[in-house]
Amino acid sequence: MIKLARYCIAFLIIAGCGGEGPYQITAESQGTKIVVGKFTRSLLESDSSFSWYRSNYDAFSPDSASIAYLSTAMQNVHFIVVGGTWCGDTKLELPKFFKTVSLSHIPESHIEMYGVDRTKKSKDGLTEKYGITNVPTFILFSDGKEIGRIVESTKNGMEFDLVGLLKQK
């Protein structure tokens, strides 16, 4: 019986260590960390390799009138966000997006975020499914239907572009 218990424990340890999580992180020779797969912003907040996230988040001050509008208009909106932790545009726009949705009280459960490699490929075919060729891409959904996108960079600022997309809906 003890022998069986040891085998079961060994199996569980091996099985637990062999599985691949929802994302992978690879480090390039110059130190850039690339996240590929589904992850949350807590990864960006907790890993010092992504210091650009906190500094750009803190530096951004969105328009208060836009935040007031978005607080009501975005409550039933869901997002798919695709970015590259290696990409300059992602480093600028992703923190602004998260500050905007945080101040608008959008729940984390309404946001799915995926990292891609330098070829802009995801682990699960998401980039092909949604035709993503540039990052970052912010896709907005309402009632399961796509209502708009922000691709690569904003035109008027994150909060203003989100307001514009929601008013077109």
Give each language-model segment a name:
Residues 18-64, 68-73, 163-165, 169:
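Non-globular targeting/processing and membrane-anchoring segments
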Residues 134, 140-169:
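Non-catalytic, surface beta->alpha helical segment in thiol-disulfide oxidoreductase systems
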